[in-house]
C-alpha cells in the first residue's frame, strides 16, 4: 500500500476520534457534525467544472474521506469508533451502483 494512503488512513481516524470526543464532551452533536460533513461533500460535488471532468472512480475517491467520517460519526459508540477497515467496507456498501 502507498505510504500516502496509510497517512490518510491515520489522519481520517484521528479526525473521526476528535469528532467522537467533541460529541461526548457535549461541544457538538452528531447531527451538527453530520451537517458539516454533508456541506463539505456538497461543496466538493457542486464544483461542476472540476467534478464533471472526473471519472466515476475519481468522484468516489474524492468523496471517500467525507463519507467515511460521516459513517464514523453516525456509528459512534460510547467510547470508540469502528476500525478503519470496517468503516471503509461500510462506505463501499453505501456506494450507488
Segments (PLM) and residue ranges:
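Long, leucine- and charge-enriched amphipathic alpha-helices
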Residues: 1-38, 73-74, 79, 93-95
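Low-complexity intrinsically disordered segments
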Residues: 37-97
